[in-house]
Amino acid sequence: MTTYQTPNPLRLRLKLEAGRIDIITWDEPRAEVEVTPLGDDQASIEAAQNVQQELRGSGENQELSVEAPSGRSLFGLRRGPELRFAISVPHGSSIDSTTVSADVAGRGRFGTAKVNTTSGDVSLGAVAGDANVKTVSGDLDVERVDGKANLSSVSGDLELGPVAGEISASTVSGDLHVTSAGSSVNAKGVSGDVTVESVRRGEARVQTVSGDITLGVAAGARVWMDVSSMSGTTQSDLEPDEGGGGGDVDLRIKANSASGDIRLQRAAPVASA
């Protein structure tokens, strides 16, 4: 294990082809990094020993990089040994991670999060700033985002807790589920379903080919709607006077699908803390 003195939140830059990355945030004024091989072969042991670690900067501008050596062959037919990064950093630190088939799990409170992966799953705690995640077949689960959320996936499912800022998301066969959206939503899918339990203001633009669309409208929000499905069904639980027939509206909904079903409903009331 390697320990670094980091009294302030830092930027954590990670690179790992295969394995697992576990990150926690804590109150301690230091960062700790432990690298272990997930296999007992010599190649895995040597790969763990050759991981590059470096702390750059000072004060509030520190950056800690942890990068595993590439284990791919000349034609990319063989991936590197599997390693595990176990990292602890101060609360509010930001993540910039690039992996191939490594899972990324972050618990605690982060500043911003940028994660690029191919087949690894991603789970994160609370993100105070923006969250940008790109995955091909990995699933994504984020507890909360206080900034903007920009997500893309091919076959992985996207699960988001409350998001205060704008949401931009695209999927092919993966599902998108959002607990609540505090601002505009722009979501595109092919066969995956799109569900936003609660949206109050801005613009909700959702398009799918065969995936179903479910949007919950927060209580009291006046809505303008443009909803259509060529061969699917459309259903709205909103009362006639709740639609924005004229005047000011809080939320503009444009939901379209080729064969998916579309449902608009009032969002469930938020329970008091």
Feature map (PLM): residue ranges:
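Intrinsically disordered, low-complexity terminal regions
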Residues: 1-273
